[in-house]
Amino acid sequence: MSSESSAEKGPPPSPAENVQPGVPPAAEEPGMISVDIAGLFYQFSKTFILIFPVYVLGYFGLSFSWLLIALVLLLWWRRNKGNKNSRLYRALAFLENEEKSVKHHIASTDLPAWVHFPDIERAEWLNKTVKHMWPYICQFIEKLFRETIEPAVRGANAHLSTFNFTKIDMGSQPLRINGVKVYTENVDKRQIILDLQISFVGETEIDLEVKRYFCRAGVKSIQLHGTMRVILEPLIGDVPIVGALSIFFLRKPLLEINWTGLTNMLDMPGLNGLSDTIILDIISNYLVLPNRITVPLVSDVQIAQLRFPIPKGVLRIHFLEAQDLMWKDTYMKGLVKGKSDPYGVVRLGNQVFQSKVIKENLNPKWNEVYEALVHEHPGQELEIELFDEDTDKDDFLGSLLIDLVEVEKERVVDEWFSLDEATSGKLHLKLEWLTPNSTTDNLDQVLKSIKADKDQANDGLSSALLILYLDSARSLPNNPLEINHDGMKKAAVEKAKKAGKKIGSSPNPYVLFSVGHAVQESKVKYKTAEPLWEQTFTFFVHNPKRQDLEVEVKDENHQSSMGNLKIPLSQILASEDLTMNQRFHLNNSGPNTSLKMKIALRILHVDKPVRSPDEQHTSQVKRPSIFKGKQPPTPQMPSPSPAVAHKPPPTPKLETNKKPENGNKGTPPSASPKSPTELHQSSSSLSGSSFTYSPSHLPAKEPTPSIASDISLPVATQELRERLRQLQNGTTLGQSPLGQIQLTIRHSSQRNKLMVVVHSCRNLIAFSETGSDPYVRIYLLPDKRRSGRRKTHVYKKTLNPIYDQTFEFSVSLPELQRRTLDIAVKHSGGFLSRDKGLLGKLLLELNTEDAAKGWTQWYDLTEDGTRPAVSS
């Protein structure tokens, strides 16, 4: 058989099969020698490239450390590059087959939002539509780059006159929408609010070059993930029904870029994070709150109001103190525990505040105040992170996420919050929701409350909010010498002359605004005397009766002033609706030069919380802050003692990272209204579940009930019945012979967790002559593993313990109807004690509709928990 036919039919036979008897083996083909030579040359070249830098260092007498530094940078760069590529390929694989990825147990962080949150819809029809439109979207993007961005870059600088895009390819993978959420509560009737969970993972290729300098650069892949809000408003009674479309990101999206060419240096260590941050800042200037893109669909819509609406409110954050923070600094290689140098980072949308650093303190006190604008709610959340300052990398101490809907509802929240993602630690915050009012009725009261003095500077707490919309300018002078010289700085003109700039060229105007010490600057508009800005600016005002708004138009090209203006804020106070919308003539400028602006002043005031009649009783159910020391003695009787009655009512507890709920409207049908006495005794509300006590948060030395006590449940039940017969001894026991337990139960669809708040117990039976040492143990059946067990602290020698502890179970709302809460009140006899027993049980079936709304109620304890009678 010939070699050609054997190659066609299959793999070549082995040498033994190929050699015929009496025929010497064929000589080796000459081609094999050339392959060896090529491999040898490749190996020699590789070795030479590795050794040559060492020779160069020795030849020039340089230090060997330069080679080590270069090697470290190369390895670090390759590692970062590999991580980026792996994330890109993983995301691409997930987008190609989402269902298969889910079945193969992909990491939960990579799953789309609709998997975690039931209120977010998958909307696959939208992805199919985008996929069909993607080629035409790519054509639009390419047209935008070539006809808009490319000419703008060329005109920005003479050195970039040969700039052009050589290739623009957005890739075949379209933008994907992982979930859509439509808001139906707490929104205006004339608007529709949608949140889109967008994800773009594309092999995008954008190449550019500057021919004059033989410079080539580009991008070969982009990843973008974030939550984009789309607002359709106002709804009108005519076609097209929607007046305008507003698009923006609620917070900075996640961005990752792989560079090519000259820009590949941006992937080097130290520059990779910086480059992404700069690009994110550019995106934030256009698409992250308070900035937005507004597309008018009808001509008579007030675009200025839609693009830059007045903020919904101002959040005053009192960043007070923390307790029991984790220790991160160690000595003698961890043998000696040190302390931490904590500081906090507070984020609200695009606004970031950082506290001072408290050295070597696990119970720091900052006592700092920040004021942040709230532009959109629901949707915006207050994010707080605590760090331990170190010389190399700051250590994480815990975080906190607070839904602002609850803060707006309560107006003032002064509370201790347990830190998430931390084994210990709690943070004391006071949050005030300030409502912008268009009247001066409360101005004197507000000025008195913040102790506003005669100081012109904007240093103290704010009494008002100044919102300024800069529209355009008219008839700006082209020649600085045309301006009134009394208002000119001669040095500025001389500087422009020395710089060789043409005096009569078109200006590059921008505007400076200042109120007190706060200064803000508009964008620069190039080569125009009729600029159009359409920008908004917001200032916090300490005392509007005494402060002024100073405006100055400057020319970046000539480094000179083109006119100025001063507006006393008291003039705005005298205007109708505290608003001025007009053209303002500029001083020290041309005769017809003017600025078109809309200026609004809003008085910041803490309004009283407004609750519906159904929510009036829930507002009284409050819970005190965490005590610094031991729990104070609890009363032995359920009726309130005088010491309790005259205590000032504590502020309401606020749940972190939860959706707006409807108070206690979801009380089960069998639940009856609580009496005023019970309301006074209750120490926690439905909205109060930010104290999340997971097993990792509990003290390590807390006594743990025996596992055998759960296994031998029939024995414990029999002993409890025997104890009841002994207590009865011929007498008639009351309606609740084993006592009662008060619980709050609610399912958070946003966090996908069931939250159970154990408030207190009353009238428990005495396990011994000295009383009982009760604690509460909880299972979410059928899960009875040790990891699924939750338990409260133990309180000694009391029959009326007050716990006020919150426990969380990860369970979806549809699955909840198949689960049962197993709650047992037990006596803890101490470590290794045999005096442990059951004080009462409660088995509670969970209804999905009721759990979504939540309720707070007293329940009777029974021997086996099969009769969960609801107390009136």
Swiss-Prot record:
Residues 784-791 are annotated as: Required for phosphatidylinositol 4,5-bisphosphate-dependent location at the cell membrane. Residues 608-617 have a biased composition (Basic and acidic residues). It is found in: Cell membrane; Endoplasmic reticulum membrane. Residues 1-31, 77-872 are cytoplasmic. Residues 119-298 form the SMP-LTD domain. InterPro entries: C2_dom (IPR000008), C2_domain_sf (IPR035892), C2C_KIAA1228 (IPR037752), Ext_Synaptotagmin_C2A (IPR037733), Ext_Synaptotagmin_C2B (IPR037749), Extended_Synaptotagmin (IPR051634), SMP_LBD (IPR031468), Synaptotagmin_SMP (IPR039010). Residues 1-25, 608-711 are annotated as: Disordered. Residues 53-55 are lumenal. GO terms for biological process: endocytosis; endoplasmic reticulum-plasma membrane tethering; lipid transport. Residues 682-696 have a biased composition (Low complexity). This is Extended synaptotagmin-2-A. It comes from Xenopus laevis.
